[in-house]
């Protein structure tokens, strides 16, 4: 299943961002960016990077609303969260001409439904959600989501899913044959 997640970097969280000359403060998903990369960036640019992490879009939103606004220069919400945050006035607007390379965004990513015209976000990552099976432990049919939702006895206690409500609900919808964009 393809899922556009962590696809947007939301720039300058509201007007009172954490901007300070020579410093960059990032709010990013847990374990997405290695410390070595941040160290290399600092060595090459002289800009000190601080990164706080979160494990879900909802945790990020709650943290920002609980007093984290203005703490970060850049945050990395998933696609649907950009729309929520922009609707609540939590994101700054990217002015025309503000990002020199904005015109280099591939057309398929330039005008997403969650941020028309890319006024609050830019593409960052795209990924797929899937599942894998250790075929040494399980030799049955692996081409079905039934092994997740109606697991055979040999998989009992051996199934783990992402801690992401949206991802699991989308997978369950596919399993049950429901359309993805239906209410």
PLM regions and their residue ranges:
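Early extracytoplasmic/lumenal segment of secretory-pathway proteins
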Residues: 21-84
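Short, glycine/serine-rich, charged loops/turns that create anion-binding
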Residues: 18, 31, 166
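Short secondary-structure capping/turn segments at boundaries of alpha-helices and beta-strands
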Residues: 11-12, 64
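Extracytoplasmic ligand-binding site segments that recognize negatively charged/polar headgroups
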Residues: 72, 77-183
